[in-house]
């Protein structure tokens, strides 16, 4: 519904007005208007389209003078109103004309006669109908009335009245010639530049002098707002003028500085850069590019552009073009250096010696990319540093954990604000040689998804056929990486993309045995901690038996990081006792170690091993090396369902279904009643439920636990097993046998069952572990069942 209005002085005589009021019905239809507040003495024109309002207009025509009640909503909304949202004060209006316009709407002209108060809503459909009472104007002191209206008119005339009122045509003439104060008041109210919702107070106020007083208040608020707006505009104008002035002065100052000093400084920089370009052994094409950029820098007057060009030239000239470090050519010295810094790790050391031997023989850098894979704490990162030291090369380390932007590898294009070179060339710059040992740490922790794929950017870096012309986006020129010895590290090879794995030579760095840890602790870690804490081996005495006790009862890890922290704690407590208690020597033994480290964190699992029903020790290969994977099975009355818990992956779940299907198919041979599967539900649980578990190698363990639970046979203590099971009961090969065997030995097991196909991998298991374990190869699950149960 659209509204238009024309502010008019009432043209009815008092007699005509009273005659009309005598004919008004006590119940009238209602039209709800929006956008404007109706005030008496106003001529309204409204476009009506709502069906219910059209019916209300039709109903009004049945009374003598076509009367309706006009109401507004509390929020002046355009939506169809609810009764609760209608104002209780409105106006009585008379329809003067009703003209049909296109689209079926009507343009209706109303004359506003008097204020009314709604008494009761009588009906809602098909149109709104109300009973009402007229709001009669209450008159106060005539002297006060005249004084107030005079003050209002003076206030309006004091300022350009267009600032206070709207629709100013004939406004002044009307209020000057209108004899009735009430009419003047209503005309001013309607024209005041205030929100229509604020005008509602005038509609419900019956006392004339109060209405005039409200006008004075609103005019005062408008005047304050106008003054505030004028002050704000002046401040904005002043700020703009000051900014323009400041900009002008700064630009002028730049020009003066350029003429006086900056110009000389820039010329000095240009001469210095030109000299560097001349002395640096750049390839011809790159030297030409550098001189072109220098020419651009010389002629550029824009500070932003000059800054980018200067950064580019600085980086280009900081790169070690053709600069190499002298490699160590004595294999015996290289081997000795590696052995002095790291215990064990023979496979990696042997590979580095081969690399050095080939380089010495061919006088060329072998194109090899090594990837050290193993659990945390086994020395992968520190070994890379030792390799650099043994070969006589610089060492650069870049951690790739959490890296997700390709630009971190290749760099940003110089068109971007804050562009920087990638990590590869930044590392080469820091090394100051083109043949460093470059460690790409945690390559399995790259963030790779449909949005990010930094692994693809590494393909060019790690491909010997491509990295001779590696292109960094920031440098925009090829750089030779063929002399760099790249070494990557990873905890879990499955997380490394296949394309990257294909470009690297994988070398497994396995978990340490107890013997390894004792040697590392006594020969390396303890000496390091004694030095770090300012004491000697006479101040802190700890023998190998105590170190073994620490390994078994205070650590549970594939590497030696926790062991190193424990030795550091013992060193700190020794220093404290030496200073406070004036001791010269602290001897740590298995009997007093709890005094310094507290109670044992891990019990000896060998003491915990008992004969159990439905519980078998599996062997797992995780991010952190090998570990035990207990499998528990129970069953209860049900409908033959299989319940799997312990945060299992899809492959592990399939192994459980396969094991159960094999047992169902062979229940007669196993001495199991077939009805037990239909009458019971089976629950398979792998403890430590918060840790995700997956893989096929638990099939043999699940099958053994199921048979034990169903037949109520005890499983011998000290057993562990690993292997994938098929529906025929065959046991297939698994990975990570070495890590699993070390974990079994560390956990106190004495016998493990492994797939027959893994016999070839037994040689990889350390001799001391092989000697302590009874390793039984099996090709079918029946071979396991015949040996694991207590007879």
From Swiss-Prot:
The Lon proteolytic domain, residue ranges: 610-791
Example of a GO MF term: ATP hydrolysis activity
Enzyme class: hydrolase
Catalytic activity: Hydrolysis of proteins in presence of ATP
Active site: 697, 740
EC number: 3.4.21.53
InterPro entries: AAA+_ATPase, ATPase_AAA_core, Lon_bac, Lon_bac/euk-typ, Lon_lid, Lon_proteolytic, Lon_Prtase, Lon_prtase_N
Subcellular location: Cytoplasm
Chief localization: cytoplasm
Binding-site residues, ATP: 374-381
Coiled coil region boundaries: none
Alphabetized PROSITE patterns for the sequence: LON_N, LON_PROTEOLYTIC, LON_SER
Domain spans labelled Lon N-terminal: 28-223
An example Gene Ontology biological process: protein quality control for misfolded or incompletely synthesized proteins
Record's keyword terms, sorted: ATP-binding, Cytoplasm, Hydrolase, Nucleotide-binding, Protease, Serine protease, Stress response
Induction: By heat shock.
Domain of life (superkingdom): Bacteria
Any single Pfam family the record assigns to this protein: AAA
GO cellular component: cytoplasm
Its job: ATP-dependent serine protease that mediates the selective degradation of mutant and abnormal proteins as well as certain short-lived regulatory proteins. Required for cellular homeostasis and for survival from DNA damage and developmental changes induced by stress. Degrades polypeptides processively to yield small peptide fragments that are 5 to 10 amino acids long. Binds to DNA in a double-stranded, site-specific manner.
Quaternary structure and interacting proteins, as annotated: Homohexamer. Organized in a ring with a central cavity.
Similarity-based family: Belongs to the peptidase S16 family.
Family annotation (HAMAP family): lon_bact (MF_01973)
Official protein name in the record: Lon protease
Annotated source species: Aster yellows witches'-broom phytoplasma (strain AYWB)
């Amino acid at each position: 519904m659209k509204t238009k209005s024309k502010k008019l002085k009432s043209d009815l005589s008092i007699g005509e007005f009273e005659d009309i009021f005598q004919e008004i019905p006590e119940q009238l239809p209602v039209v709800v208007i929006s956008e404007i507040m109706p005030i008496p003495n106003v001529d309204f024109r409204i476009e009506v389209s709502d069906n219910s309002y059209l019916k209300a207009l039709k109903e009004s025509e049945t009374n003598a003078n076509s009367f309706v009640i006009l109401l507004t909503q509390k929020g002046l909304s355009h939506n169809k109103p609810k009764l609760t949202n209608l104002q209780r004060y409105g106006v009585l209006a008379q329809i003067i004309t009703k003209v049909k316009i296109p689209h079926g709407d009507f343009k209706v002209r109303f004359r506003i006669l008097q204020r009314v108060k709604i008494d009761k809503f009588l009906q809602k459909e098909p149109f709104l109908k109300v009973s009402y009472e007229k709001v009669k104007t209450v008159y106060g002191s005539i002297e006060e009335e005249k004084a107030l209206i005079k003050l209002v008119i003076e206030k309006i005339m004091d300022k350009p009245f267009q600032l206070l009122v709207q629709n100013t045509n004939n406004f002044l003439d009307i209020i000057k010639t209108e004899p009735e104060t009430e009419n003047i008041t209503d005309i001013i109210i309607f024209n005041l530049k205030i929100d229509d919702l604020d005008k509602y107070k005038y509609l419900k106020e019956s006392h004339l002098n109060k209405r005039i007083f409200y006008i004075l208040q609103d005019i005062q608020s408008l005047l304050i707002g106008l003054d505030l707006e004028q002050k704000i505009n002046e401040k904005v104008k002043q700020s703009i003028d000051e900014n323009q002035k400041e900009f002008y002065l700064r630009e002028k100052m730049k020009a003066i500085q350029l003429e006086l000093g900056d110009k000389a400084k820039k010329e000095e920089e240009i001469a210095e850069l030109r000299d560097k370009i001349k002395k640096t052994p750049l390839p011809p094409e790159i030297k030409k590019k550098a001189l072109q950029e220098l020419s651009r820098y010389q002629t550029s007057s824009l500070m932003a552009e000059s800054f980018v060009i200067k950064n580019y030239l600085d980086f280009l000239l900081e790169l070690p073009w053709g600069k190499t470090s002298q490699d160590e050519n004595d294999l015996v010295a290289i081997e000795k250096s590696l052995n002095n810094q790291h215990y064990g790790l023979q496979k990696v050391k042997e590979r580095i010696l081969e690399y050095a031997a080939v380089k010495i023989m061919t006088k060329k850098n072998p194109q090899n990319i090594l990837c050290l894979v193993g659990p945390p704490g086994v020395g992968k990162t520190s070994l890379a540093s030792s390799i650099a030291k043994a070969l006589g090369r610089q060492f650069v380390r870049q951690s790739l954990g959490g890296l997700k932007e390709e630009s971190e590898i290749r760099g940003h294009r110089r068109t971007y604000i804050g562009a920087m070179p990638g990590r590869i060339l930044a590392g080469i710059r820091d090394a100051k040689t083109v043949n460093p040992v470059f460690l790409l740490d945690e390559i399995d922790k790259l963030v790779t998804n449909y949005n990010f794929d930094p692994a693809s950017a590494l393909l060019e870096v790690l491909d010997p056929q491509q990295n001779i012309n590696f292109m960094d986006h920031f440098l925009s020129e090829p750089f030779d990486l063929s002399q760099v010895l790249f070494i990557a590290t990873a905890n879990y090879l499955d997380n490394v993309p296949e394309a990257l794995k294909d470009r690297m030579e994988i070398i497994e760095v396995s978990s340490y045995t107890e013997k390894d840890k004792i040697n590392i602790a006594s020969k390396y870690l303890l000496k390091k901690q004694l030095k770090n804490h300012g004491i000697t081996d006479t101040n802190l005495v700890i023998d190998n038996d105590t170190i073994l006790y620490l390994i078994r009862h205070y650590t549970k890890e594939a590497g030696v990081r926790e062991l190193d922290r424990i030795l550091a704690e013992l060193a700190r407590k020794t220093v404290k006792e030496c200073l406070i208690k004036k001791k010269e020597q602290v001897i740590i033994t298995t009997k007093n170690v709890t005094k310094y480290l507290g109670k044992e964190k891990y019990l000896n699992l060998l003491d915990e091993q008992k004969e159990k029903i439905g519980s078998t020790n599996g062997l797992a290969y995780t991010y952190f090396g090998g570990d035990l994977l207990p499998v528990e099975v129970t069953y209860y009355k049900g409908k033959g369902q299989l319940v799997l818990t312990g945060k299992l992956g899809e492959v592990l779940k399939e192994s459980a279904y396969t094991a159960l299907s094999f047992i169902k198919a062979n229940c007669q041979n196993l001495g199991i009643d077939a009805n037990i599967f239909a009458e019971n539900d089976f629950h398979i649980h792998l403890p430590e439920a918060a840790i995700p578990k997956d893989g096929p190698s638990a099939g043999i363990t699940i099958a053994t636990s199921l048979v034990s639970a169903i037949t109520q046979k005890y499983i011998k203590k000290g057993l562990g097993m690993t292997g994938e099971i098929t529906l025929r009961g065959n046991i297939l090969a698994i990975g990570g046998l070495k890590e699993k065997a070390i974990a079994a030995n560390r956990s106190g097991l004495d016998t493990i069952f492994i797939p027959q196909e893994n016999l070839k991998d037994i040689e990889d298991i350390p001799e001391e572990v092989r000697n302590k374990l009874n390793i039984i190869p099996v090709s079918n699950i029946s071979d396991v069942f015949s040996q694991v149960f207590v007879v």
